[in-house]
Swiss-Prot record:
<keyword id="KW-0547">Nucleotide-binding</keyword>
<dbReference type="Pfam" id="PF07714">
    <property type="entry name" value="PK_Tyr_Ser-Thr"/>
</dbReference>
<dbReference type="InterPro" id="IPR050994">
    <property type="entry name" value="At_inactive_RLKs"/>
</dbReference>
<feature type="domain" description="Protein kinase">
    <location>
        <begin position="59"/>
        <end position="357"/>
    </location>
</feature>
<feature type="binding site">
    <location>
        <position position="87"/>
    </location>
    <ligand>
        <name>ATP</name>
    </ligand>
</feature>
<comment type="similarity">
    <text>Belongs to the protein kinase superfamily. Ser/Thr protein kinase family.</text>
</comment>
<feature type="binding site">
    <location>
        <begin position="65"/>
        <end position="73"/>
    </location>
    <ligand>
        <name>ATP</name>
    </ligand>
</feature>
<keyword id="KW-0067">ATP-binding</keyword>
<protein>
    <recommendedName>
        <fullName>Probably inactive receptor-like protein kinase At5g41680</fullName>
    </recommendedName>
</protein>
<dbReference type="InterPro" id="IPR001245">
    <property type="entry name" value="Ser-Thr/Tyr_kinase_cat_dom"/>
</dbReference>
<dbReference type="InterPro" id="IPR011009">
    <property type="entry name" value="Kinase-like_dom_sf"/>
</dbReference>
<dbReference type="InterPro" id="IPR000719">
    <property type="entry name" value="Prot_kinase_dom"/>
</dbReference>
<dbReference type="GO" id="GO:0004672">
    <property type="term" value="F:protein kinase activity"/>
</dbReference>
<dbReference type="GO" id="GO:0005524">
    <property type="term" value="F:ATP binding"/>
</dbReference>
Amino acid sequence: MMACCLRNKRRMKGKLSWKSKKRDLSHSGNWAPEDDNDEGKIVFFGGSNYTFDLDDLLAASAEILGKGAHVTTYKVAVEDTATVVVKRLEEVVVGRREFEQQMEIVGRIRHDNVAELKAYYYSKIDKLAVYSYYSQGNLFEMLHGKLSFCIPLSMLLWYAVSKTNNSTFAGESQVPLDWESRLRIAIGAARGLAIIHEADDGKFVHGNIKSSNIFTNSKCYGCICDLGLTHITKSLPQTTLRSSGYHAPEITDTRKSTQFSDVYSFGVVLLELLTGKSPASPLSLDENMDLASWIRSVVSKEWTGEVFDNELMMQMGIEEELVEMLQIGLACVALKPQDRPHITHIVKLIQDIPTNFNL
């Protein structure tokens, strides 16, 4: 894919510089010998009409959307009319060449159900990925609520370096979702994951499927973001893997995620859509019982109706559809990887759910 490179030839005056000596370089990741003379550049993918550079990003108005273990996410308004999502990557464990190769694979993926990678930036000190912005927020926010706040991006970037608390910001912006909305999100996200798995000659893996990485596009279908980041950043701590509720039981290193484990994570998202429960929330007296285990336990007692979100149960005539989706979700979270369905089969199963909605 054709790309346009804009080199960072000047530093900001009076604002935090990417090259600031105050910055902590200990989390900059592996630094390959070929990187020594690279001062950093923004690479835009073909078809992008953006003209901003690094200084424009730093000076732009920004809103922090969340902070994960190795990624801090910002909503950034540039060029007056353009709004993008900027992800600042920490604990990057690959050199420039491998980083760029991964970004090029992601940058070639163009689909309505996959968030578009607009550009990336790589230097010795900082690594950024610039994605499309989705105004409706992510699925986690819709189901469980979340609060974000607005301060200048340069201050946020400095704050992110020293911040050690990996928790998200809780709020009350929960959005009621009817069954049609949840079904559209599920179908779209399944299609997006199928496209992702086709990339790199059918070998590509997302590695971090979860509701906070699923947005809705202009047609209200699910759209997957954050692809390409898992394999270039340090693996999540074991405590985070287990407590998140999304990762397959066989995964002990997120950099070694597989398409089978992606399907497991997607299955958890389906169960989250059906129950309205966060996979990370306590679900029983047993602290080790995650969402998938809790649902298996309830279903085994033939109390299937108890698992569904009360908001869904108030809708008439959708019980059979809910049960069919539940069966798909449970198939995805099979304990043995080889027992999980292929994502293309999952797409067909969801599309074949009989419904009165025009999807």
